[in-house]
Amino acid sequence: MEAFHTHTGIGVPLRRSNVDTDQIIPAVYLKRVTRTGFEDGLFASWRSDPSFVLNLSPFDRGSVLVAGPDFGTGSSREHAVWALMDYGFRVVISSRFGDIFRGNAGKAGLLAAEVSQDGVELLWKLIEQSPGLEITANLQDRNITAGTTVLPFKIDDHTAWRLLEGLDDIALTLRKLDRIESYEATYPDWKPRTSPVA
C-alpha cells in the first residue's frame, strides 16, 4: 500500500446522506476475484442519471469526495473502498462513517476524514461556488484546506499511523517476519506448520 501524507484534488459534492455500501457498489459488481476493476460499479444506479455529480465536469475528474452523514454504512464489503479508489478517489470527507467502511478504508489506503457536519456543508458551498476547487487533505496535520478555509478532521491514531507508513494488513504482518520464523523454527515437527515465505 502506498503511504498517504497529503493529497490535493478536485472536490466532489455528494449531497446525499445514509449512503450504504450497496449504493456505493451494487452486489452485481462483486463477482470479480481481483481487487481492481470496480470503478464501473461505483454509484452505478445513480450514474445512469446524466445530472449525477460524477457525470458533470469537472467533478468527473475529482479525487476528494465530500459526502453527507453516515457514508459507507451497511454490509462490510471491501469492494466499496476498492470501487472508490479504482475510480480515482483518495479522500472521502463526511461527518460520520460506517465503522466497517472506515476500517476498510484505512486498510486499503483511502483516507476517511471525519469533519463536523457544518464543515461538510461549508465545503459543499465552496465547491458549488467554484467548481473545480481543489481540496487538500493533510494527514500529518489532520486538516482539510479548501481555498482559505482550513478544517480539522478526526481519525484514530492507529489508522493514521498505518496510512502514513503505508502499511496494509500484510505489511503489518511482514514487519514481524523474524519473530514468526523464529517461532516456526522451534515449533514441534508433529504439529501443523506454515510454509516459509519465498
UniProtKB/Swiss-Prot annotation:
<dbReference type="GO" id="GO:0009098">
    <property type="term" value="P:L-leucine biosynthetic process"/>
</dbReference>
<dbReference type="GO" id="GO:0009316">
    <property type="term" value="C:3-isopropylmalate dehydratase complex"/>
</dbReference>
<comment type="pathway">
    <text>Amino-acid biosynthesis; L-leucine biosynthesis; L-leucine from 3-methyl-2-oxobutanoate: step 2/4.</text>
</comment>
<dbReference type="InterPro" id="IPR033940">
    <property type="entry name" value="IPMI_Swivel"/>
</dbReference>
<comment type="function">
    <text>Catalyzes the isomerization between 2-isopropylmalate and 3-isopropylmalate, via the formation of 2-isopropylmaleate.</text>
</comment>
<keyword id="KW-0028">Amino-acid biosynthesis</keyword>
<keyword id="KW-0456">Lyase</keyword>
<dbReference type="InterPro" id="IPR000573">
    <property type="entry name" value="AconitaseA/IPMdHydase_ssu_swvl"/>
</dbReference>
<dbReference type="InterPro" id="IPR050075">
    <property type="entry name" value="LeuD"/>
</dbReference>
<dbReference type="GO" id="GO:0003861">
    <property type="term" value="F:3-isopropylmalate dehydratase activity"/>
</dbReference>
<comment type="similarity">
    <text>Belongs to the LeuD family. LeuD type 1 subfamily.</text>
</comment>
<comment type="subunit">
    <text>Heterodimer of LeuC and LeuD.</text>
</comment>
<protein>
    <recommendedName>
        <fullName>3-isopropylmalate dehydratase small subunit</fullName>
        <ecNumber>4.2.1.33</ecNumber>
    </recommendedName>
</protein>
<dbReference type="InterPro" id="IPR015928">
    <property type="entry name" value="Aconitase/3IPM_dehydase_swvl"/>
</dbReference>
<dbReference type="Pfam" id="PF00694">
    <property type="entry name" value="Aconitase_C"/>
</dbReference>
<dbReference type="InterPro" id="IPR004431">
    <property type="entry name" value="3-IsopropMal_deHydase_ssu"/>
</dbReference>
<keyword id="KW-0432">Leucine biosynthesis</keyword>
<keyword id="KW-0100">Branched-chain amino acid biosynthesis</keyword>
